[in-house]
Curated annotation (Swiss-Prot):
Function as written in the Swiss-Prot or TrEMBL entry: Activates KDO (a required 8-carbon sugar) for incorporation into bacterial lipopolysaccharide in Gram-negative bacteria.
Domain of life: Bacteria
Listed EC numbers: 2.7.7.38
Organism of provenance: Haemophilus influenzae (strain PittGG)
GO cellular component: cytosol
Protein name: 3-deoxy-manno-octulosonate cytidylyltransferase
Gene that produces this protein: kdsB
Broad class of where this protein is predominantly found: cytoplasm
Length: 254
């Protein structure tokens, strides 16, 4: 099975400007992400950026680059531009990896592509089990609820499902007894290329605007998303300077 990885690499991050070029163990961060994508077995890896400096660095380490607009409001809009510019066939599987995930396990990149190929859906993703109450109640940890076959019922920053008997008078989140139903969504997606174009035809929905989760547009419009448990839990991504230092320490040991 062939699949293409697209890695968006925005230069103007509000919390960590220029992070695609941040040095980690002697390489720019975006090169680490690119190398992980190659290790997944992808037949093509494309880095999508809106910055000429990033594009020059990417070309220097031998990766394919696609220049995109600076005006996109979401990562999906950037993917759609790449798909259109490069005339990627509608049936091609596209895996979207964030450009700030230098520690992403290659095995889960392959897994999400396989997940899409196995099921009659246009979009697939992964999740991991939630093991502590702090993560469960953290709005930055997106929860996902599925049916018995792994098809998504809903994504939320709130706790879903809500355990009425346990949570109603909860005093200490550390004392929560967690059921297997509690899953944290991992922000890695696989799509059919043509579906990305279809997605762009739908107007933003109230649900996604409230939760700030663009994948809810897919559910709202009646499409299904399949989610599997990730074979490996990904390590920290890089959103802040503190995250960057953590990743540098991890890769310095390798």
């Amino acid at each position: 099975m062939s699949f293409t990885v697209i890695i968006p690499a925005r230069f103007a991050s509000s919390r960590l400007p220029g992070k695609p070029l941040a040095d980690i163990a002697g390489k720019p961060m975006i090169q680490h992400v690119f190398e992980k994508a190659l290790q997944s077995g992808a037949n093509r890896v494309i880095i999508a950026t809106d910055n000429e400096n990033v594009a020059d660095v990417v070309k220097n380490f031998g990766a394919e680059v696609c220049m995109t607009s600076v005006n996109h409001n979401s990562g999906t809009e950037r993917l759609a531009e790449v798909v259109e510019k490069l005339a990627i066939p509608d049936n091609e599987i596209i895996v979207n990896i964030q450009g700030d995930e230098p520690l992403i396990p290659p095995v889960i990149v392959r897994q999400v592509a396989d997940n899409l190929a196995k099921f009659n859906v246009n979009m697939a993703s992964l999740a991991v089990k939630i093991h502590d109450g702090e993560e469960l109640f953290n709005p930055n940890a997106v929860k996902v609820l599925t049916d018995k076959d792994g098809y998504v019922l809903y994504f939320s920053r709130s706790v879903i499902p809500y355990d009425r008997d346990q949570f109603m008078n909860l005093q200490d989140v550390q004392k929560v007894q967690l059921a297997d139903a509690y899953l944290r969504h991992i922000g890695i997606y696989a799509y059919r290329s043509g579906f990305i174009k279809q997605y762009m035809q739908w107007a933003p929905t109230q649900l996604e605007n409230l939760e700030k989760l663009e994948q809810l547009r897919v559910l709202y419009n009646g499409e299904r998303i399949h989610v599997e448990l990730a074979k490996e839990v990904p390590a920290v991504g890089v959103d802040t300077a503190e995250d960057l230092e953590k990743v540098r320490l991890i890769l310095a040991k390798d």
